[in-house]
Amino acid sequence: MFSILGNSSKKKRNTQIYRIFFTLTFSLSNLFLAICYLFLNVRTVSSDSSVSLYDRQLFDQSSSVILNPDTSDPSIVLSSLETMRDLAHDIKFGQDVLEQPLCDQLFVLMDGKDYPNTIRSMSSVVLASALSNNFIAQKKALEMNIMPKIVNTLRQENHPVTLLKKLFLLSKSVQSFPLSEAFISKDLGSAILLQLYDFWSRNSHIDIPSAFQEKLLSRLSIIFENIARSLENVNFSKASKVIPIEWVFSTWCSIFQKYLMNNWHLRSISTLEVLLNTVSTIQSVSESCPEVNFYEWLNDKNLAYKNKLIYQDPDLATEFNLIIKEALSLPWPKKYNI
């Protein structure tokens, strides 16, 4: 009997020890979490809870270098631009990029022929990051009349890689309908892009790889797809009375349609996908795509398999057949005799 009582009291002591152990473990765990929480939030700026003190210091330091590029090594200027590019994805910092004199200085770097192309290209990407999906930054850009500056910097560019980065900036700008309208309204923007496309797609550019020409067309395609998407929440018939959008869409959609029909079996999958999606988006918004034989070409049941890369990959074939099917379901003009 004493043995039984002794075992019972021992079990109680063990139970108490386990409880104390787990209580201490749980408390230490909570203490660790609390310390981590304080560590992560100690950097918060009291005046602006949306950004941290550390990030604000990074932004200000980068801005100081960018505003005085000639006093720093080019590698430091490039590093500062890369830092600002990353920070500009934040809504607050994106707005700050559009403040003066920083915004104007980015255009100075973009067009400065004495600066390395890496710096010129990254300056474009910083502005693109600031404008991407940032309504307030886009509104500020419109108030600053930024579009003529973007068009002008495109007109001056003669370096292939830097040109692509500047087109990337334009593609982010025209996500907003007011900026799309500013780009198209005087037909200045579209005319510049036609000149660029004509110049860089000539056969005389034997030193320019075909891969660049594909990237150029893809970037142009994305620009007009974004313009079309910016019209989705706008009355298209009213918009077309204000800006020459029908002519612009018709001109560029014809270029994209002809390229698809003439180069389907030759070009990369990504290029074909981008162009086909752009044609579909323009057609769904405006019904402005003019090539009469495009629907017949698109309606070929074996179309996807006429590209070797698609033919060799069943998953790609399935994906492209879905894209083609979606394109065929659009409201094509009556002249297609559907």
UniProtKB/Swiss-Prot annotation:
Biological-process GO terms, alphabetical: SRP-dependent cotranslational protein targeting to membrane, translocation
Main subcellular localisation: membrane
Entry coiled-coil feature ranges: none
A single MF term (Gene Ontology): adenyl-nucleotide exchange factor activity
InterPro entries associated with the record: ARM-like (IPR011989), ARM-type_fold (IPR016024), Hsp70_NEF-Inhibitors (IPR050693)
Membrane topology: Single-pass membrane protein
Keywords on record: Membrane, Transmembrane, Transmembrane helix
GO cellular component: endoplasmic reticulum; membrane
Compartment(s): Membrane
Gene3D superfamilies xrefs: Leucine-rich Repeat Variant
Transmembrane segments: 20-40
Official protein name in the record: Uncharacterized protein C1071.03c
